[in-house]
Structures are given as C-alpha cells and as structure tokens.
C-alpha cells in the first residue's frame, strides 16, 4: 500500500511538472519576425485595381475589416459607406477602405456585397496573407480602425455607426 501511495505521489508530481513546463513553453513567442511598424506605409491593391496606401498621403483613413459571410458586418460596411459619402459631400480629407479578411471570397462576391450594403463607392481589398490584419493587430471581423496621416491607429471599435466614424476621422485630422 505504501509503495502505491509513493508511486502515485511521484507520478502526480511528475505530471504537474510536465504540465507546468509545457504551459511555460507555450507562453514564449517563437515568431522570429517582428511585426511591421504601423507607421511604415503599406500599399494594397483594391479589387478594382486601385493602389491604396495606408496611411493615405497624410490624411486619416477609416479601415473596416469584414467578410461577406459575416452577418454582423453588414451594418459596419454600410456605416463605412455612409461616412464616406458624408466626407465626400463635406470635402473632408479622409480615405476609406473595406478589407475582406476571407481570402476565399471572390472579387465578384465582394462587389455584390458592397453593392448590397450601398457601399460600392468605397474601395475594397482582400487581406492576402492576413497582411493588414496582422499589421494593425485586428483579430476579429467587424472591426474598424482609424489611422491618422502618420500611420498611428487612433481609434478601434466593433461596428461603429457613421457618425462615430466621421467624428473619429475629424479627431485624427480630417
């Protein structure tokens, strides 16, 4: 009986040590490539062939991350479109970009979605290799970020309305 208790105790301690060492190993960052500096300009090609720079030549940019299959993203892209229309009418110096996080969605599918939500006037791009979502630390669909003219993210939210997007662009220098 004593041998069994000793054996159990030894195995329990060994198991805890193994679990602890595995947990600590998982906490380490093994990615040897540093994240890109958000202030360094990035260029993406929209689905209609436009080159879009982030940040956009000294002016703030609202960037919304979505997927056509995301039901919650409908209102967010619609709000982005409304904010873009308001900025154009007021002459505010701001840029807009809708970024599809699903590389499997076709250009035609994205175009149809943008038309459906009345945001076809907003440039849209596919986040190839998750380059933009990684660069700006976006992990969830339906996320909007505002980037000022220097490349700094000044605002981050999930599905803000058009008024909030416009107000945050003004704060960022529009």
Report the location of each language-model feature.
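Bacterial N-terminal signal peptides that target proteins for export
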Residues: 2-14
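C-terminal motif of bacterial Sec signal peptides marking the signal peptidase cleavage site
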Residues: 22-26
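N-terminal "domain-start" segment that seeds a small globular fold
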Residues: 27-53
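Short acidic-hydrophobic, aromatic-tinged amphipathic segments that line or gate anion-handling sites
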Residues: 44-46, 123-128
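Short active-site neighborhood of thiol/selenol oxidoreductases, capturing the structured segment around
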Residues: 53-74
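Thiol/disulfide oxidoreductase modules built on the thioredoxin-like
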Residues: 58, 118-119, 128-171
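Hydrophobic beta-strand anchors of alpha/beta hydrolase catalytic cores
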Residues: 62-63, 96, 144
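Structural microenvironment flanking redox-active thiols in thiol-disulfide oxidoreductases
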Residues: 74-117, 128-131
